[in-house]
């Protein structure tokens, strides 16, 4: 007994010595869990593989099981020749092979990729409908073991839909459009990279969440991918992914016959064009015999398409679909088609109507291997949108939902935003087609309209950063996407808790803290960026990152708010607006047509109302804006305190990396809060009843300080500076000093400095109080892997804050900041804030 206690003590000490990790293994860390001798003896000690050929998913399953048991339990699983009744073994096989070799087994009907998992102590059977399903079952069992779940189970599970793909927007030069985790793992300098190790690891992660295909290149495709040398490169990518049951697909440029093939047309009905594409497809399948198919973006945002020749979208899609049919390939055709030169003066103009207008009348005209890939909302991955009505308008056409793991409009992985609760607002939405239950999840699976093909696509955009997405916590979104694509009725919080256990361990405080932070994160981000259905009030013209609400209007992009001095919101009603509500089935349209029945969180999406309109909550629209933005920023600051409570419970490398992002998010949430509130206060003249907006008693505006070598600078947009003005050095190669006498009472304060970190320079600042240097820092965010879209301008994208905690000051002390310009960055400063510890200004 005493020996066992000593063993447990040593094991606990070893487990407490948290080793440094960089995130490369994601949720497949296979971290050790406690398992005493009795526990070990109750688990399998052998692995048995049936029909395991070299490079097959079943061989991969055996390798993963061995590696997992060794790492998790320090158990060496030995291979054993196949026997039907192997004891103390994990048996992995396809169901058909097992039935041929052994007795029949009572297993429920499985769909392709499905599996049966039976665990009875030291005997485990994993039977897949196919080899890929068997691999999925192995990962399922390993996930149980990694979470110290040794319970007896016996169940079958099949995928919600056959298509469970990820999209990468990787360019041939190695950049990634809307990617925030480093350069491409697939391409560099116009060709496919040599090193396939990251590709294999990515495929491994995807297989573990049951993703079955990757589209490896940008939807804004470069035709040079179709050159013979790049086809050879695609073959190497496919070879790296194949052992994990992950197929590859590619995006196509519609004009390739002209751009690459030397034809004078890309008309989809031209016989020469048809022959050219068939030849290209034949060649691709020579290099990649199991290629999943194509993804096409056409007639959208400058991309060529069939409309050039007055052909329909279905005629364009069918060109590729027919070329793929002999090989069983799928054509994913994006529904993201709209006019980006709309006339805002036309009250009826509405980009949100475009998808239904373009596709509804073509229903039933697409080939059976065409799937229309529909964004979850009718605009573009906003913080909240209503469900795209196109899902309700295609009875005779296969559909898939398009989600975005990459946080293009949602903080670009620099802000914690756990996305499944957002996705579930669409997946669980009942469109009531023909007055019958019509959940979006049942439409994309094919169940509602009796379609055999359909499913899921997500824009992921992993890169060479060891965290894959740039942020450790952002990986929860990729994990959850795979889980939901398999089983969309799973609860967001349960998925999150499973991911946390696999990624950060079994500590209950860690699990509860990360769960609470993450489940709060989307509402918080919505609060401080754009609420009531107004969309994300970011800069839609360039970065899609920082606040810039003015860019929503006065252009042809159609993401309008129609905000003015008196009122705000898009009137999308039938009776007085764009008629968008009429694209929904009758029961849904009736809800959104009425201001009284429209939920508050979408009121500005569907209705144009006075700023003084009272919501169902009883609060006016403008006051809701003010309140929500303050609440959101307060929540973001809470994330830092919550994360800091995990110090010592998470390895130092991941703890510090994530803490720095959360600190940044807290500061940037203040930038967002003030920019949006100041913009609309300036527009409406309606004050905040709580007296917060425009009143910051703890701040010292930089332009009010004594300046030497600094000059004032009027920031544009004005709301991106606390008092519309910042200071910059008089040249880009000089030093400036700003000083002031502290008027605050003596005491201990947190000193925050809001400044601008521009791309293309690394200014240096030194903060002093009295005769003591408080701290120094560099404007080097472009080099410290923060990863968001950079900016060379003073604005909401480059604005940020650094805080020095627990600084003792005396009233009358001189506060001084010395800024040394570098490159294009003139050491810009906005304001200093002196806060009693724990207060959010």
From Swiss-Prot:
Record EC number: 3.2.1.139
Compartments where found: Secreted
The UniProt record lists the keyword Hydrolase: yes
Catalysed reaction, written as an equation: an alpha-D-glucuronoside + H2O = D-glucuronate + an alcohol
SUPFAM superfamilies the record matches: (Trans)glycosidases, beta-N-acetylhexosaminidase-like domain
Enzymatic class: hydrolase
UniProt protein name: Probable alpha-glucuronidase A
Organism per entry: Aspergillus niger (strain ATCC MYA-4892 / CBS 513.88 / FGSC A1513)
């Amino acid at each position: 007994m005493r020996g066992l206690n000593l063993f447990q003590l040593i094991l606990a000490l070893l487990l407490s010595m948290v080793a440094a990790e960089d995130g490369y293994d994601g949720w497949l860390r296979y971290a050790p869990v406690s398992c005493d001798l009795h526990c070990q003896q109750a688990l399998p000690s052998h692995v048995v593989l049936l029909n395991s050929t070299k490079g097959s998913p079943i061989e991969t399953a055996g390798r993963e099981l061995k590696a997992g048991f060794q790492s998790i339990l320090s158990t060496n699983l030995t291979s054993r020749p196949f026997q039907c009744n192997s004891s103390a073994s994990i048996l992995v096989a396809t169901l058909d092979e097992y039935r041929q070799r052994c007795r029949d087994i009572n297993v429920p009907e499985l769909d392709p990729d499905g599996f049966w998992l039976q665990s009875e102590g030291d005997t485990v059977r994993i039977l897949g409908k196919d080899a890929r399903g068997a691999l999925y079952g192995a990962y399922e069992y390993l996930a149980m073991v990694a979470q110290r779940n040794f319970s007896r189970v016996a169940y079958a599970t099949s995928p919600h839909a056959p298509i469970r793909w990820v999209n990468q927007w990787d360019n041939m030069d190695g950049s990634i459009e809307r990617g925030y985790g480093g350069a491409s793992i697939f391409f560099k300098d116009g060709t496919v990279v040599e090193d396939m190790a990251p590709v294999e690891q990515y495929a491994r992660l995807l297989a573990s969440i049951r993703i079955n295909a990757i589209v490896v290149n940008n939807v804004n495709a470069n035709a040079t991918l179709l050159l013979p040398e790049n086809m050879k490169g695609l073959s190497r990518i496919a070879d790296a992914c194949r052992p994990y049951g992950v197929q590859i697909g590619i995006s196509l440029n519609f004009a390739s016959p002209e751009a690459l093939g030397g034809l004078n047309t890309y008309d989809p009905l031209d016989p020469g064009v048809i022959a050219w594409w068939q030849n290209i497809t034949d060649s691709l399948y020579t290099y990649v015999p199991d290629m999943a198919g194509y993804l096409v973006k056409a007639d959208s945002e400058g991309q060529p398409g069939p409309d050039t020749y007055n052909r329909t979208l279905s005629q364009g899609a069918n060109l590729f679909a027919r070329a793929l049919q002999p090989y069983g390939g799928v054509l994913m055709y994006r529904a993201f088609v709209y006019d980006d030169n709309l006339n805002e003066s036309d009250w009826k103009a509405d980009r949100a109507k475009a998808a239904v207008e373009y596709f509804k009348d073509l229903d039933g005209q697409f080939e059976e291997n065409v799937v229309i890939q529909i964004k979850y909302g009718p605009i573009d991955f906003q913080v909240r949108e209503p469900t795209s009505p196109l899902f309700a308008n295609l009875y005779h056409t296969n559909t898939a939902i398009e989600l975005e793991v990459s946080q293009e409009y949602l903080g670009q992985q620099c802000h914690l935003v756990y996305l499944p609760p957002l996705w579930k607002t669409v997946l669980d939405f009942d469109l009531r087609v023909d007055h019958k239950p019509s959940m979006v999840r049942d439409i994309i699976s094919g169940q509602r309209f009796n379609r055999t093909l359909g499913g899921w696509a997500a824009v992921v955009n992993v890169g060479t950063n060891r965290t894959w997405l740039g942020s450790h916590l952002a990986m929860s979104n990729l994990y959850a996407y795979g889980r939901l694509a398999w089983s969309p009725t799973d609860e967001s919080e349960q998925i999150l808790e499973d991911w946390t256990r696999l990624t950060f361990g079994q500590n209950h405080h860690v699990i509860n803290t990360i769960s609470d932070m993450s489940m709060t994160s989307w509402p918080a981000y919505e609060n401080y960026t754009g609420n009531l259905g107004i969309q994300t009030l970011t800069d839609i013209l360039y970065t899609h990152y920082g606040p810039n609400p003015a860019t929503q209007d006065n252009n042809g992009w159609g993401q309008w708010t129609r905000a003015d001095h008196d009122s705000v919101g898009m009137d999308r009603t039938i009776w007085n607006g764009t008629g968008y509500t009429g694209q929904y089935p009758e029961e849904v349209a009736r809800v959104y047509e009425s201001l009284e029945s429209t939920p508050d969180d979408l009121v500005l999406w569907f209705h144009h109302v006075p700023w003084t309109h009272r919501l169902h909550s009883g609060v006016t629209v403008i006051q809701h804006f003010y309140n929500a933005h303050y609440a959101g920023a307060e929540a973001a600051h809470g994330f830092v305190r919550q994360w800091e409570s995990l110090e010592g419970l998470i390895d130092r490398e991941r703890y510090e990396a994530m803490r720095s992002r959360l600190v940044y998010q807290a500061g940037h949430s203040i930038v967002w809060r003030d920019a949006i509130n100041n913009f609309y206060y300036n527009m409406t003249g309606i004050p905040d009843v709580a007296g917060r907006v425009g009143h910051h008693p703890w701040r010292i505006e930089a332009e009010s300080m004594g300046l030497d070598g600094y000059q004032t600078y009027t920031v544009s947009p004005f709301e991106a500076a606390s008092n519309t003005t910042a200071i910059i050095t008089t040249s880009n190669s000089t030093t400036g000093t700003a000083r002031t006498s502290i008027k605050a009472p003596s005491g201990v304060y947190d000193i925050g400095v809001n400044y601008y970190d521009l791309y293309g320079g690394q200014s240096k600042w030194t903060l002093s109080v009295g005769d003591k240097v408080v701290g120094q820092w560099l404007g080097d965010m472009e080099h410290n892997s923060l990863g968001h879209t950079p900016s060379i301008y003073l604005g909401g994208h480059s604005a940020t804050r650094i805080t020095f905690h627990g600084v003792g000051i005396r009233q009358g002390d001189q506060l001084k900041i010395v800024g040394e310009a570098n490159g294009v960055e003139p050491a810009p400063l906005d304001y200093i804030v002196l806060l009693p510890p724990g207060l959010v200004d």
